[in-house]
Amino acid sequence: IRLQGNSYCVQYSFSQDRDVSHTLALFMERVYKHDAEFAEFFNKMAVCKKQCCMKDVAYLQSPSQRCKAKFMNLEESVNWAYKMLQLHHKLTTLEKEVFSFLPAYASFIDEMQDIVSCVHFIEKEMKYNGLSKSTIAKCRMHINATIMCGNERMKRVGASFLSYLSEEDGLLKNTEIVNNSSDLIETTFGIFKYIQSPNKLNGVTTLLLHLPLILSFAGK
C-alpha cells in the first residue's frame, strides 16, 4: 500500500509530506542501530529490569522496551534513565548496587536525553501547529541550539533533521500549513481493528474499505 501510494504521488505530481514521527525515528535508527554503546546500554537496562522482579527495588525498574518501532518509543526509557541518574545519590545501598551501571553511562544518557527532548519539541510543534515555514524555522533554531552543539553522533542526527526540514520547506507555499502526522489515521484504524478483532494477526486488507464509514460517523 505504501509503495503504491508513493507511485501515485509521483504519477500525478502530488507533493508528499512525510510523517514527522516515523521520519525522525528513521534518522535516529540510522545513527544508533549498530552503535555499540547504544546496544550495550539498552541491553544492560533490559537485564537490570529482569533482576528487579520480585525484589524490594522493583518499584524503580525501567519501562518495558519496544521490540518493534523501538526508535519511535525511546523517550520513556531515556527519561527513566535520566531521572534515575539525577536521583542516584539518594538511593539506598542495595538500590545503588542494582542500578550501578547508570553512572558509567552518564554522558550517553545526557546525549540521549538531548536527542529525545529535541524530537519531542519538533513533534509537538508540528502536531500542534502544523507543518509551515514558521514551525520549520522554530525547529531549525531549536536543533541548532541543542543537538548540533553536541558530539559527532548528535550532529549526524541533527544534520539529518535539518536536511529533512529543508526538503519539506521546499514543498511549501509561503503561507501554507499542512498536516504531516499520521497519528489520527493510525489511531482511528487501530481502534476499529481492535473492535473488529482483538487478534493482532488478523488481516487488515479486508477492513480498509470500512475506514471511510467510521470516519463519516466520527463527529456524530
Tell where the protein language model's regions lie, with residue ranges:
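Acidic/histidine-rich catalytic cores and adjacent linkers
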Residues: 2-11, 18-220
